[in-house]
Amino acid sequence: MKTHSDRKSGLHPRNRHQAPYDFDALCLRTPELRPLVFVNEHGTQTLDFADPAAVKALNKALLALHYGIAHWDLPAGYLCPPIPGRVDYLHRVADLLAESAGCVPTGKGVRVLDIGVGANCIYPLLGAREYGWRFVGSDIDPVSVKAAALLAKSNGLGGQIECRHQGNAKHVFRGIISPQERFALTLCNPPFHGSLDEASKGSERKLGKTVQGQPVLNFGGQKAELWCEGGEAGFLATMIVQSKEFAAQCLWFSSLVSKKENLPAAKKALAQVGARQVRVIDMAQGNKVSRILAWSFLDEVACGQWWQPALRGGV
């Protein structure tokens, strides 16, 4: 039997999802996926990737088979992320950390902050399994914080993943990073759209269909996950300005940037706040192209010195 044949070109070499999905193995590990798999006109096993239930079942199977994450679920209506692309972000920034650490740093001595952890808790779960990193995940949505914490605990990672509620939606880091904390890295997948209407129209274009005249938001998604005032560009600008306050406490700040036209303004903002190093790291999965924007307020020498206490004491 053939399997889904779209090779995920452009993924990081360490990404476990280079090959087509092995639906037989996935269904064996997660039987609930089997009824959702069908053979298309080309004789290839596949899914309806516009069906949120199918994508959710695929995620559960991928996480269980490849990462030993046996318990994964979502509250109704929350964002269901694509696993190959999410783990690719982690592999790319792991290489960034390796530049100053001398090798890809692993273990609980590497602390990572995930801004907007979401109910899916996907970056902490994958990062803990792939690299053994220790995570703090923050979110302005209390339901997401509770759901993410439950996922961490259910998979035996409660001591490695801490979820914190951000009580002030205007703050990105303040109220989350305490005065004595240090993080090797911050992650963020910022809201893409600037309004609910924009998010709905974008989803309608993507799916090319409506249900009873109402746009279908593919894979779910709550307000904080999908849109914020100013959209991606506005969120990036706020995060960049606010990152300066924590310049000495974080080795690298980073964010996904879906719209490449947002990069020039972001780079200008980084120059204005005095970032010493700025990187744009390209990512690709099939036809989907994105990039990571990363910045540090430390020069290369200071970055190298960072790891001396970090790898000793787990700060």
UniProtKB/Swiss-Prot annotation:
Gene3D superfamilies tied to this protein: Vaccinia Virus protein VP39
MF (Gene Ontology): 23S rRNA (adenine(1618)-N(6))-methyltransferase activity
One Pfam family of this chain: Methyltransf_10
UniProt superkingdom: Bacteria
Swiss-Prot/TrEMBL GO biological process terms: rRNA base methylation
Location of the protein in the cell: Cytoplasm
Reactions catalysed, as given in the entry: adenosine(1618) in 23S rRNA + S-adenosyl-L-methionine = N(6)-methyladenosine(1618) in 23S rRNA + S-adenosyl-L-homocysteine + H(+)
Key words, A-Z: Cytoplasm, Methyltransferase, rRNA processing, S-adenosyl-L-methionine, Transferase
Gene Ontology cellular component list: cytoplasm
Enzyme class: transferase
UniProt keyword rRNA-binding, yes or no: no
EC identifiers of the protein: 2.1.1.181
HAMAP family, sorted: 23SrRNA_methyltr_F
Entry's family note: Belongs to the methyltransferase superfamily. METTL16/RlmF family.
Function: Specifically methylates the adenine in position 1618 of 23S rRNA.
Name by which UniProt lists this protein: Ribosomal RNA large subunit methyltransferase F
Originating species: Aeromonas salmonicida (strain A449)
